[in-house]
Amino acid sequence: MTHRSNLLPAFFALAMAGMPLVFAQHENGKKENVLYVWASDQAHKAPDFLAVVEFNEDSAHYGRVISTVPLPPPGNTGNEPHHCHLSTDKKVLACGGLLSLLKGQNGIFFFDVSDARHPRFLLSTKAVESSITDDFLPLPEGGFLITQMGSASGEAPGRIAEFDGQLHFVANHFGLMSLVQEWPSTPPLDGFNPHGISARPDLNLMMTADFILPTSTLNGTTGVALRNTVRIWDYRARKITKTVKLMSPDGGPALGIMDVKMLPGDPNGIGYVAGMFDGHIYMIDPRTGTGTAAFDCEDVQPHVDTPVVGGMGQILATPKSGDRLIFALFQAGQVGMLDTTNRSNLKQVPGAIVSFGANSGPHNLVLTEDDSRLVVSDYFLNEDDQGVIHFEGDHKVRVIKVTHDSLTEDTRFQLDFNTAFPTGPARPHGLAMK
């Protein structure tokens, strides 16, 4: 029997009441000086861990690992660390374990980062009707919406798990946040496997992107089932109002909609998604519930030939100017910028592209609050002997300097997770800055 104690209700208090999330300012007007990287030991022997990295550009140790915070046992290996996100008040870091289910472990982890350079592990937990934890959307009032790509058994339908800001400690290191709900109350049965999530609370709109049926990627299954749907939500009611089924220009379905990003400030709530295996970026119009191809990644210059058409577009990032979209191509090894002035016909910003080399694997993209730096992690997912997904990347974490019309690699920042730790090569995935 577990025993709850030490209620900590304050971690997710709103930092600036009434301020829209996408326009939050730096705490005390300061730039981020600490980078968190949520990672795993490639050999699955050392614990999964949070790396704390010097992110102060004025420091002589810029780009060096300050410390690591390993997960405590039990359940501290084999979680496949995936995405992470800071709470609105930047005091708690929430992290996900994509494959925790395969070992019967909790898959949602929380760290106290109120002392930015000395984070400490708080607790782990899991949802009830869902698993395969993916992305986190911090809520202005505290807590998170979390995409759970699979059901409790890793199949369909998945859910959006909502946790409020009440933290409860229980016996051992396991715990429960106050789980408000898993949404929607009656989930659709047409391939609801949400991966990406984006919201415009000011418009009462939210979007989620269905990517893949998780269990279909495991050994012994009949084949990978990719999804091509985007869900439009009533943000406040937590209710799906429209389902957008995307078709590629060749007439077939879009293949694997991993991420979704809504443009800041767009009056209609326009968003964008990338078809990972069909090579297109699609515009989503929530008013009409439609999606159309807006850019062909085969047209990216310089062009890199890759096994997957379009170089394998995955994660997107949206500067607050509202007229730019940043994308990463995993197999092409490129990070580029698109002009979104014409919402349905995106154009590559001339010269705004950084090439790291074919198969370097840029995947996760996170902008600083002032949009001046973009952090990139070069690792997606390797299921090793458990499944058919083997997208390793080169395990580097990089920084790109960003202006309205340019992307330039910050060569002062050098961080290679193959050599940074005495335990051996590690796989960097989740990113957050404070």
Sequence positions of predicted segments:
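Surface-exposed loop and turn segments in beta-propeller and other repeat-based domains
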Residues: 64-79, 123-129, 172-192, 240-256, ...
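Short, conserved, GDST-rich strand-edge loop motifs in beta-rich repeat architectures
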Residues: 37-44, 95-105, 147-158, 208-227, ...
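Loop/turn-rich, solvent-exposed surfaces of beta-rich toroidal or solenoidal domains
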Residues: 306-390, 395-397
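Structural signature of eukaryotic scaffold interfaces centered on beta-propeller domains
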Residues: 25-31, 80-89, 136-140, 193-204, ...
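Beta-propeller blade signature
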Residues: 51-55, 106-114, 157-167, 223-237, ...
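Blade-loop segments of beta-propeller domains
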Residues: 63-137
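Beta-propeller domains
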Residues: 87, 189-342
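Asp-box/WD-like beta-propeller blade repeats and closely related beta-sheet repeat scaffolds
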Residues: 107, 113-201, 210, 216
